[in-house]
Amino acid sequence: LRQENREQFKDQVILIKGARKFRFEYIAGFLQKQSHATVLEVDFDAMVHNLNYFRSLLPRKTMIAVMVKAFSYGSGAGEVASLLQYQGVNYLMVAFADEGVELRAAGITIPIGVMNPEPEAFDHMIEFNLEPEIYSLELLEAFDRVLTKHGIEKYPVHLKLNTGMNRSGLDPEDLPALLKFFETKRKVIIRSMFSHLAGSDEARHDEYTLFQINRFIEMTKEVQARFDYPIIRHILNSAGIERFGQYAFDMVRLGIGLHGISAVGAPLWPVSSFKTYIAAVRQVKGDQTVGYGRKGVLGRDTRIAVIPVGYADGLDRHLSCGVGEVWIGGQRVPIVGNICMDACMVDITDTDAQVGDEVEIFGKHILVTELSDKLGTIPYEILTSVSLRVKRIYFKD
């Protein structure tokens, strides 16, 4: 391979297939352009397992929309979307039009909804057949005017109803004006009506969740009664599917559950593994310090490993000084001193670790939920914080 001109493979898709024991990732590494050895491994088998788990909770007729916004929660937009399209999901949902345009460029042909449409992007959305969420009458009127300009009719939109999240959406008192708008022939059709649950993952909010669901039922009945075509209804997110599956309606929206996070402790599989390697090892005397601000106080002679991952890669700086750990050689070792922009140091005194050994930041041994709990945040933030300079590697047996 080293005798080959790698430029001949530019912009080509190459299938490298075989058992993991053959370490074909070395061939992939030779061919790829991005060579930073800190990587995010994405296990497509785990993702399909998780998708099928949520499918098993739903009636067969229930459609599934999958959230692929924010680079598919950090896992890679086009790659994950292609897998989901192959797996037969009904809709993909992105946050902004640019994300949808990127998916179309990657060959995605199934319907794509845009959750945060901006009027400036309406023309792009129409060009690439992206379906906007409509959360206000003003936005609906603006989009209808753009459709009139293009001479387009029956363009699908998704009506967002505010049932208690109080972030965006049409309130019950907005419905008369909405229905009056449709008394005149319009260029849009309502493809779906949906709402967002504020606390479906926590039992302490169950009464409020049921209040939201009942309000959603009332609002959608009022709207549907004025139209002679069926409008899709959806309110359940990942936690809602697990805890309130009887309200699946016509479609559900799967997000964090696809990535292995369950609201009920279900045996989902971790999808992403954030990994690097030991770049250097040094012996440091116990009376010395390590890192910026001399915050790495040792107290004993210590073997320090330097690993090429820092806060610019997505390793949260609040994990500095022993708060966080990494997995090396079958055990946990603590982070020493302050995490740097591009590197951090860990204590490997009690291991046989050497230069070149693999390091797991999170994955099968240190779960994303463990990190989010330790940092007082949510798994979404951990996953979406992994920098784009970190290479994504996809596995499927």
Predicted regions and their residues:
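ATP-dependent carboxylate-amine ligase
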Residues: 1-49, 97
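Flexible, charged surface loops at secondary-structure boundaries
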Residues: 6-10, 126-127, 246-247
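Glycine-rich phosphate/diphosphate-binding loops that line cofactor/substrate pockets in enzymes
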Residues: 7-10, 51-62, 152
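Short, solvent-exposed amphipathic alpha-helical segments in soluble enzyme
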Residues: 8, 30-33, 81-83, 130, ...
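Short, Asp-centered acidic motifs that coordinate Mg2+ and/or phosphate
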Residues: 13, 91, 251
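Short glycine-rich anion-binding loops that position phosphate/pyrophosphate groups of nucleotides
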Residues: 13-15, 19-23, 162-165, 238, ...
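Active-site-proximal beta-alpha core segment in soluble small-molecule metabolic enzymes
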Residues: 39-49, 62-232, 248
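Active-site anion/phosphate-binding pocket segments in diverse small-molecule metabolic enzymes
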Residues: 41-43, 48-56, 63-66, 99, ...
